[in-house]
Design a protein with these regions (language model features):
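PLP-dependent amino-acid enzyme catalytic core
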Residues: 1-468
Length: 468
């Protein structure tokens, strides 16, 4: 399996190469030359597998340059009890009225990002050790990616992490998870701005090929294909757990940067019988607007709202380019032209392709408000006893619009509610204690560097602290 760029300017590379590469040299994103296919008989044969062994089967289709027994060791190290609280790794719970909850928050940072990041922590160390080199991870987080990456990579050999976060725009629990880490290879940088500005700095630094090469910059954001591939596994798992034999399921996905639902798009393209991919946004509804109108119109920082589902306060979805690549017939020249239009005009129009969004690719979309979130959290708890976080509530609210008889609808859990205590208290009128082992998290000393949104200042910080 080789990988190319969505913009056509990268020679085919292996899985391990793109794992370390991050953004492609031409500014595009790595994508498989062709998607591997899984037939119905193979799918059925995977029903009895553990999550770790299912991950091996799926990831072996993408990471063809890693010997099979080595890869199996990596997936078993990543997906095991002790790292994850549930024996199933990803439990499925009933929510009633045709909905089920895919439990993706059983990992060490209580968020779905752990599902991919625990594998990345293993495979980064594996590849770097065998190549005898180092890597400096530079990423941006709106709340959950940062802590998941840092917990997966803390203390790992040959890796340093530089994680940018928007100052004052994450929950207290999210900040404490990241900033309380004291490991010497973890560096937190809070920038005075919004997530999109932090992400722009990361892309700017990654786009400087001389700097990227000298300091061996890598990525753990979902621009890294390994993140997307690892997330594909839980769509297979969800189908195997919820679908009647040979039947279809739908997935509802709270969406900000388009990485999570993109993995569903990939799983569907590989052969998982997915009826619909239901995209749910909050008030920052750039993606919902695209699937409703066909026009992609990102907003500036001044029009990116601070909401009660803060991890989705994103107005430029970096992973969207991979879907557009498929939408325009895998034409890299067309993708490069569209992103040039975006840079020049601030938008592009694919409304002529709008009929394909659902009929060919299964995408539908909806948005949720603060009032919707509070009501959904309260009603879900009252009706089922299941407490969900505000992002998952966005998913449930939108999912209800698209439930079909006989087609299970799995809502992807985003995080545990303890990470968003203020919103849960507003919804239920009472506080939700964090897990016992994290009760003192917010009182721990915190280590973070505060900066303006200045790529040169971030560059200087990396130069001073990088592993070289």
């Amino acid at each position: 399996m080789k990988y190319i760029s969505t913009r056509g300017g990268m020679a085919p590379q292996s899985f391990s190469d793109i794992l370390l590469e991050g953004l492609a040299p031409d500014g595009g994103l790595a994508i498989p030359e062709q998607l591997p296919q899984v037939d119905a008989a193979t799918l059925e044969s995977w029903r009895g597998l553990s999550y770790a062994d299912l991950a091996f089967e799926v990831l072996s289709l993408f990471a063809t340059d890693i010997p099979a027994e080595d890869l199996r060791g990596l997936t078993r190290a990543a997906y095991r009890q002790g790292v994850f609280k549930s024996e199933d790794i990803v439990p499925v719970r009933e929510l009633g009225q045709g909905l089920q909850l895919l439990g993706l928050s059983e990992g060490p940072t209580l968020a779905f990002k752990d599902m991919a990041m625990q594998f990345l922590g293993q495979v980064f160390e594996y590849v770097l050790t065998r190549r005898g080199t180092t890597l400096n991870i530079v990423g941006a987080t709106s709340g959950d990616t940062g802590s998941a990456a840092e917990y997966a990579l803390r203390g790992k050999q040959g890796v340093a992490v530089f994680m940018l976060s928007p100052h004052g725009r994450m929950s207290a629990f999210q900040r404490a998870q990241m900033y309380s880490l004291q490991d010497e290879n973890i560096h937190n940088i809070a920038v005075r701005g919004v997530f999109d500005q932090a992400q722009d700095i990361v892309k700017q630094l990654a786009g400087d090929l001389a700097f990227k090469t000298r300091y061996r910059l890598g990525a753990v954001n979902s621009i890294n294909w390994a993140r997307i591939a690892a997330q594909v596994v839980y769509y297979f798992h969800g189908w195997l757990r919820a679908a009647p034999k040979g039947g279809e399921v739908s997935f509802a996905v709270p969406s900000g940067n388009f990485g999570n639902i993109l993995s569903g798009h990939i799983a569907r393209g590989m052969g998982v019988p997915i009826r619909r991919l239901v995209l749910a946004t909050n008030e920052n509804n750039v993606l919902e607007e695209f699937f409703r109108t066909g026009v992609y119109r990102p907003r500036g920082p001044e029009h990116t709202y601070a909401t009660s589902s803060p991890s989705m306060d994103i107005s430029r979805a970096s992973n969207f380019e991979r879907f557009v690549f498929d939408l325009v017939g895998r034409d890299p020249g067309r993708v490069a032209s569209l992103w040039a239009d975006l840079a020049r005009d601030g938008s592009f129009d694919l409304s002529a392709l709008k009929p394909q969004f659902e009929t060919r690719y299964g995408f539908v979309a909806g948005a949720s408000s603060h009032a919707d979130r509070l009501l959904t959290i309260r009603n879900t708890f009252d009706e089922t006893g299941v407490l969900v976080d505000p992002h998952t509530a966005d998913g449930i609210k939108v999912a209800r619009q698209f439930v079909e008889p006989g087609v299970p609808m799995l809502v992807l859990e985003t995080a545990l509610p303890a990470k968003f205590a203020e919103t849960i208290e507003a919804a239920l009128g009472r506080t939700v204690p964090p897990p016992a082992d994290l009760a003192d998290l917010e009182s721990l000393p915190q280590r973070v560097t505060l900066m303006d949104c200045d790529a040169q200042a971030v560059r200087a910080f990396i130069e001073a602290h990088a592993k070289v």
